[in-house]
A protein has these predicted regions:
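Conserved beta-strand segments of the P-loop GTPase G domain that flank and frequently precede/overlap
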Residues: 23-27, 47-50, 76-80, 104-105
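Loop/turn-to-beta-strand initiation segments
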Residues: 18-22, 41-45, 69-78
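Conserved P-loop NTPase "ATPase switch" module shared by AAA+ and STAND
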Residues: 37-57
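Alpha-helical scaffold elements adjacent to nucleotide-binding pockets in ATP/GTP-utilizing enzyme cores
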Residues: 5-9, 61-65, 93-97
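Conserved ATPase-coupling elements of RecA-like P-loop NTPase cores
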Residues: 52-63, 86-88
Length: 137
């Protein structure tokens, strides 16, 4: 199920305003996700948090079963990090294949990849948290 921090974030971001257009589904296998995405009016954006919890371990298989099968859908893949790099071979393979990579640190998001004009540019996710993080860094 959803963790407490996620539930608090949904409340803080007033996600009830988009009820019916935003859905959280947990514990799905990739085959279940495929079944959901085959349905009419299924989600156009899918967030997978995190790739380490998928029941598929091969990037080639994930690409074939999800990305190639649903080319009009957008997938946002979240990865755990170990020593500044995506954790595990599949996460590393995803990193090299994807067009846009977003690295987060200290409540700031940095775009890394083909579309980044300025490597130092960032988006502040949470002002108060970022101020505390960078003040004490």
């Amino acid at each position: 199920g959803m963790g407490l921090s996620f539930k608090k974030r949904i409340k803080r971001l007033q996600m009830k305003e988009v009820a019916g257009r935003f859905k959280v589904v947990t514990g799905l296998k990739v085959s279940d996700l495929i079944d959901r995405l085959k349905r009419p009016k299924s989600a156009n954006f899918v967030v997978i948090d995190s790739v380490q919890y998928l029941d598929v371990r091969s990037f080639d298989r994930l690409k074939k079963e999800l990305f190639d099968r649903f080319p009009r859908k957008s997938f946002v893949l979240v990865s755990q990090v170990y020593k500044g790099r995506p954790k595990g071979k599949m996460a590393d393979d995803i990193r090299f294949d994807c067009g846009v990579k977003i690295h987060t640190q200290g409540f700031r998001a940095y775009c890394q990849g083909r579309y980044a004009d300025d490597a130092e540019a960032y988006f502040t996710i949470w002002e108060e948290g970022a101020a505390k993080y960078y003040l004490t860094e």
